[in-house]
Amino acid sequence: MAPKFFGIEHILYLIISSGVASAALLLAKKYCKTDRQIKVFFKCFAALSLVVVVASRFAQALCFGGPRWYMLIPDSYCAMTSLVLALAVLLGKKNNPVLHFVWLLGLFGGVSTAIYATFLGQNPSFFFPPTILGLLHHSLTATLVVALLLFKQIDVTYKKWHYTLFGFTCYLTLGAFMMQVFPISDAFHIAEPLIPGTALTSWVMAPMYAVGYALVLLLVELIKKRNARKCGNQK
C-alpha cells in the first residue's frame, strides 16, 4: 500500500524533520558566533541542500520508466527555488540579490509542500527516491531560509521587490522554453494548475503571490519602524 497523505510515515517524517531542523538551528545559533563560523555553517548547509536537490532531479529523470535526462532541469517552482537558493548561498555573498527573490518562495513552498505532499502515493515505498528526496529538499530549503533570517543574512526590504519580478520572468521563460523543446505538457504550472480541478496556474498564482509578498513586506516595514521607535525611546 502506498504511503498516505498524513499517514503514519508522513506524520513521523514531519515530526522527525521538524525536530532535527529545530535542533540544528538552535545548535548553530549557540555555537556559531564569529562571521567565519557563520559563513562555514551556511556554506555546508547550502552544499547539503544542493546535493539533495540534484539527487532529487536524478531520481525524477531515472525512476519513471527510463532515462529522461531533460528532467534534470527543474520544471517546478519548488525544485528550481531549492536549486537557486542553494547556489545563491553557496556561491553568493550575504544579502545577495537572488536571495530577495527566492526566500519567500523557498519558505512557503518548502513548508506547504512538505505538509501537503500530494506526491506521496507515487510508489508503495515511502523511501522511493523521488518521494523521500522530494520531501527532504523541500524541508532543507525551508530550514535554510529560516536560518538566513535567524542569522540576519538577508535584509528583507521593499526596496528590492523588483528582483521578484525578474525571477518570476526567468522561471516562466524557462518553463515556456521547456514546453517547446522537451516532450512535456507543462512546466512551472503554465498550462496546468498546481492543484487539479482548480484555476491555480501561474497566471493566477503570480498575482496572488505578488499581493501576499507585498503584505509581507509591509508587515516587515511596520516591525522595523516599531523597533526603531523602541530603540529611540530607550536612548
Feature names for model-found ranges:
Residues 65-77, 124-134:
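Non-cytosolic membrane-interface motifs at loop->transmembrane helix junctions
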Residues 14-25, 78-90, 137-151, 205-221:
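Hydrophobic cores of alpha-helical transmembrane segments in multi-pass inner/ER membrane proteins
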Residues 1-44, 49-55:
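N-terminal topogenic module of multi-pass integral membrane proteins
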Residues 87-151:
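Membrane-proximal helix-loop-helix units in multi-pass membrane proteins
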Residues 2-16, 159-170, 178-218:
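Membrane-interface transmembrane-helix boundary segments in multi-pass integral membrane proteins
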Residues 55-65, 115-125, 181:
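Juxtamembrane "helix-exit" motif on the non-cytosolic side of transmembrane helices
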Residues 30-42, 90-99, 151-162, 226:
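Membrane-interface helix-boundary motifs at transmembrane edges
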Residues 54-55, 83, 111:
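Hydrophobic residues within the alpha-helical transmembrane core of Major Facilitator Superfamily
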